[in-house]
Amino acid sequence: DQTNPLAELRHKRTLSALGPGGLRRERAGFDVRDVHHSHYGRICPIETPEGPNIGLIGRLASFARVNEYGFIETPYRRVRKVMQPDDPELVGCALREDIKDPETGELIAKKETRIDAKLVKKIQQLKLKEVLIIPYVSETTEYLSADVEDRFVIAQANTPLNEHSEFVRTRISTRYHSKFDFSSRDSIDFMDVAPHQIVGISAALIPFLEHDDANRALMGSNMQAQAVPLLTPDIPAVSTGMEYHAAMDSGQVVIAEEDGEVTSVTGNRIVLHTSSGDKVYQLRKYQRSNQSTCIDQRPAVVKGQRVHRGDVIADSSSTEGGELALGQNVTVAFLSWEGANFEDAIVISEKLVQDDDFTSVHIEKYEVESRDTRLGPEEITRDIPNVGEDAIKDLDDTGIIRIGAEVGPNDILVGKISPKGEKELTPEERLLRAIFGEKSRDVKDTSLRMPHGERGKVVDVKVFTREDNADLSAGVDMMVRVSVAQRRKITAG
């Protein structure tokens, strides 16, 4: 699925319970399809198809990964409560209880004292096995699978912390197994890494997702993947911060592989001067995606600009400034309009149509093959019987349309003639025809033409011959593929 960068990304993150060794749609009950507490941070509870596959096909959550055994893991920040006296991270922590000399009973440090390097030395001299500290959230993350996670008490990502990463409150909202509860800070083992850890990429792109009904959020996250790339992408005015990551991870934007300076920028390539020499990045121009949408990369840098490794140097369809830009920022009014917006209908301004705000480019491919038939070989040619000069004005000498030609319904893209006749040719007749090239033979026009109602501009022509492509299907001598780009304005329906 390549409708837009998000569709491509979520296609690659799909999980299915169907197929060999899996379930059958008809046999899968409600229990299998329902959301389970082990999905938390692993499988998105929102992104799933509506229909017979609901709950059987899912998407990976934002931070989930698959481990070496095939189990899905999710990251958590470790909460540290006990430390070894020789731990370098002990400096800056606060004591959970008084420290006394085990031999004399002398008070070394009071409870809640902030540990410094001097106190660490004293503690190490006491030869204590461990030091109890006020729990703090460390920077180390650990990936846990569902069965391991069930053993721990986990705090929410938005739990307030002080400047020392310690819990501000004594009672904290936590999760243990499938129960949500309030726990003391001493019993917490881990903390979520981010609030959107629970949802997938598409759902994480919806602002204020927590205020939406789950059913409508499901529709919204699925419909984002159906958005066709527009002529002028527009970054959302209200974003969630996931737009950059979604665009980068989709693989459609061009990223600088090294630090360097831009020495040349043209429509179809960018040259970067780096410490290891000049690096040329070729851009994809007007390429057809699997869904017939247009993949067109545009430079996002200017000549002389310094770029760093990992910077976006070229945008693709539905991205702007290296961020995902699926739609347009428009003013929406919530009111009745003489019944024209009854139920799920909407009224849009004519200005949006005139300004091409919602205009998209679609590229269709048309193919024709010349075969060796029983009556003789078909031929791709400009010499087509009973066709006026006007119909073949854009064809080259070989009978193939030129790039840049405007075509409409029933226009010839590739001229082709096929032999017609009731009888099969004998080998002798074939030989004579090959030698003398009998022009007056009986042929019919089997040219490739534009379908009814279709029009556009030819953006690419590819010719495949038997000599260059041995994998052409049997009996095919030559194949021509013509790509036609079409601008489509937003229309009713």
Which ranges hold each PLM region?
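Intrinsically disordered, low-complexity regulatory segments
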Residues: 1-493
